[in-house]
Swiss-Prot record:
GO cellular component entries: cytoplasm
Protein name: Gamma-glutamyl phosphate reductase
Role this protein plays: Catalyzes the NADPH-dependent reduction of L-glutamate 5-phosphate into L-glutamate 5-semialdehyde and phosphate. The product spontaneously undergoes cyclization to form 1-pyrroline-5-carboxylate.
Major place of residence: cytoplasm
GO biological process, one term: L-proline biosynthetic process
Disulphide linkage map: none
Keywords carried by this UniProt record: Amino-acid biosynthesis, Cytoplasm, NADP, Oxidoreductase, Proline biosynthesis
PROSITE patterns membership: PROA
Pfam families, per the entry: Aldedh (PF00171)
Protein localization: Cytoplasm
Keyword Amino-acid biosynthesis listed: yes
Amino acid sequence: MLEQMGAAAKAASYKLALLSSREKNRVLEKIADYLEGQSEQILLANEQDLAEARANGLSDAMLDRLALNPARLKSIADDVRQVCNLADPVGQVIDGGLLDSGLRLERRRVPLGVVGVIYEARPNVTVDVASLCLKTGNAAILRGGKETWRTNAATVKVIQQALEECGLPAGAVQAIESPDRALVNEMLRMDKYIDMLIPRGGAGLHKLCREQSTIPVITGGIGVCHIVVDDSAEIEPALKIIVNAKTQRPSTCNTVETLLVHQDIADTFLPALSQQMAESGVTLHADPRALALLQDGPAKVEAVKSEQYDDEYLSLDLNVKVVADLDDAIAHIREHGTQHSDAILTRKLSHGNRFINEVDSSAVYVNASTRFTDGGQFGLGAEVAVSTQKLHARGPMGLEALTTYKWIGYGDDTIRA
C-alpha cells in the first residue's frame, strides 16, 4: 500500500513543481471552497472519532483538540485562503552573478519534492500541512493520530476532489488511513519516495524517527521552555509576561515550563508570583529555596523532583527554581532545555546580550513571552512545525522551509578552462 502511495506522490510532485503561483492559489481556493461545501461528511467522521475517543477515556482537553464544528471548519478553510496571500518562495533567485569564466550562475528556490508528516491528533494539521505543501509545489503523505483517522481520511478525500477538479492527481495529497503502528515504521524507510520527514508529536515519536528513519528528519516541537527573572527585572511587567507564557494556551510547545529566579530578587518576586499563579490556577513545583518563600502563599505548591525539570507539562504546572546568577540560569537551560524557546526578563542590556549569545535555542527573547514562537506571529504565515535542530530549518517552519535550491548555470557555449 505505502509503495503505491509513494510512487503516486513522487509522480504528482513533478507536476506540482511546474505550477505557477496563480495555478497553486487556484487549487488552494478550490480546497477552501470544498471544505466548506462538503463539511457534513467531515463533521460526521469527526463525530465518530469523538465517540470512540470518549469510549476510550480521553480527557476533556484532548477531546477539545480533536473536535470540529462548523465554525472551526470555516476557520480552517479561511486559513487555507490566507496561504494564498503568502508570497510564493518557489522560483525566487537567492543569489548569483557572472563568473570570470563567462558562466552566469544563479541559486534558485525549488520544491523539496515529497514531504512526509507524522502528527498528533489535531485535525486542522491535515489541512495546514497540505496547503503549505501545495503552495510550495510539494506532494504530501500524511499520517495523523489514530484518534482522528476517520476525520483525516474524510478531509483528504475532499482535498483530493478539489485537486482532481483542477486537473491535478489525487496523489498530490494522501493520508495513511490505517491506525496500524507498523505502517509508521514502514513509512520511515520510504527514502525512495519521501524527501523530508517531519514528526509532530512526543519525545517517543521523535526518538523513533531519529533512530529508524532512512529519510532526512526535521525534529522539534518539544518545548521545555524557560524564563529567567533577572535581578533587575521589574515585578509587574515580569508577572504579566509569565502569566501570558504559562496560561494563554498551556497545551502548546511554546508555553513556559520552568521559571529561573535570581536569588537577589526572589524574596520580593516569589510572593507576588504566588498570588498571580493562584489567581491563574497554576500549580508550582519549587526547589528548596523557592519552596521556603512560596509555601505560605496562596498558590498551590509542592517540592519539585529533579526529573520534572525535563518535563513538558502542557498543563497549568510550572517549575520554579532560585538561581545564584545568570551563569547558573544559563547552565540550567543548557542541561534541561530542548532548544525551543527561552526568555530573560531584565533591565540590564549586558545580561540580555549575554543571554542571546549564550543560550543556543531556536528562539530567544529579551523581555517578551515565549508564546511568540509561531509562524503567524513571526510573519511567516502558517507553519508546518517548529524545528529545534539546526539543519535544514530552525524555528517556525513556514513556506521557505519547505523548499531547497538548485544551482543553474547559463552559458554561451561555455567550457571550463
